[in-house]
Regions:
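Conserved catalytic or regulatory cores that recognize and/or transform ribose-phosphate-containing ligands
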Residues: 1-119, 124-287
């Protein structure tokens, strides 16, 4: 593929040049009806897989929320762990901070000590409070606990939208993480929150907005997908070469591209086989 990229006249060479031209002239257009990114936090089962509640929420979104991409931090972290050159500098908290900035909404299922920690971390940021959708046990609605008087009160004061707090009678204990309970009770109000599309005006993006070495946002993520769709399947080193062709050699792309690939894998619009990344979405985000 690298040979095709550098060889004049090949399809990959033409596609890369076309990308570079449009990006260089600030002519990349983003439509207004793009999907939301929903960051889903909560517990894991003993085998490391997402809790039964999180699996049910993902299944619900895939069937009924076609305007949303749900994703988990663990899948992004897994992709970053492939970087043998710099894996020691990665930690889940820093990755979660980046993902929370990227997300349109953050759903936290309060089902474990780790999820309470995530609530405290996200609620500390005034910028993130308005994004939070908290799923909690009905029995704790009126309890004078640190959670209610601290992070939940802070979120309420910030957003003044009680619809961001969803309650039902949750099963308790470790079995509740391993097996499904009645979380379907909150599906209707969750649908009401997430199905609303705040349709944005179509935008024309600048080159600096798309450079993955300086950005980790929905636009840069969508752009990397479109490169993979146009030029793929691609190996990581080939994607790096294309990024250098479009944006220049002055940046370090490997780690940042792995983070972009991680979120694309997590929202299931690309996949990877034998180290080749390819699109499952089959349509371009940008025009």
């Amino acid at each position: 593929m690298l040979t095709q990229l550098k060889k004049v006249g090949t399809e990959v060479h033409r596609a890369t040049n076309l990308f570079a031209t449009y990006v260089g002239k600030n002519k990349v257009k983003c439509p207004g009806d793009v999907k939301k990114f929903i960051f889903l936090c909560g517990a894991n089962k003993n085998n490391g897989e997402p809790s039964a509640r999180r699996i049910e929420l993902i299944d619900f979104s895939e069937k009924h929320l076609s305007n949303c991409h749900f994703f988990l931090a663990e899948l992004v972290f897994k992709e970053l762990s492939k970087d043998e050159e710099d894996s020691s500098s990665d930690n889940l908290l820093d990755i979660e901070a980046d993902l929370s900035k990227l997300a349109d909404h953050i759903i936290i299922v309060l089902e474990s000590f780790s999820s309470f920690t995530e609530l405290g971390a996200f609620a500390y940021s005034k910028q993130l409070r308005k994004k939070l959708i908290i799923i909690n046990n009905t029995k704790f609605i009126n309890e004078k606990s640190f959670i209610n008087m601290g992070p939940i009160k802070a979120i309420t004061q910030q957003s003044q939208q009680s619809g961001y707090f969803l309650h039902y009678k949750m099963a308790e204990g470790n079995e509740s993480i391993e097996r499904s309970d009645g979380i379907g009770q909150i599906f209707n109000p969750l649908y009401d929150i997430l199905s609303r599309n705040d349709r944005a005006i179509a935008r024309t993006l600048k080159k600096e907005d798309l450079d993955p070495s300086n950005n980790f946002n929905k636009d840069s993520v969508r752009f990397i997908h479109d490169i993979i769709l146009a030029c793929g399947p691609l190996k990581l080193n080939e994607l790096i070469e294309i990024a250098i062709k479009i944006f220049g050699k002055d940046s370090f792309y490997r780690k940042e591209l792995l983070k972009h690939l991680g979120i694309l894998m997590a929202i299931k619009i690309i996949s990877c086989k034998d180290d080749f990344y390819y699109s499952l979405y089959k349509q371009y985000y940008f025009k």
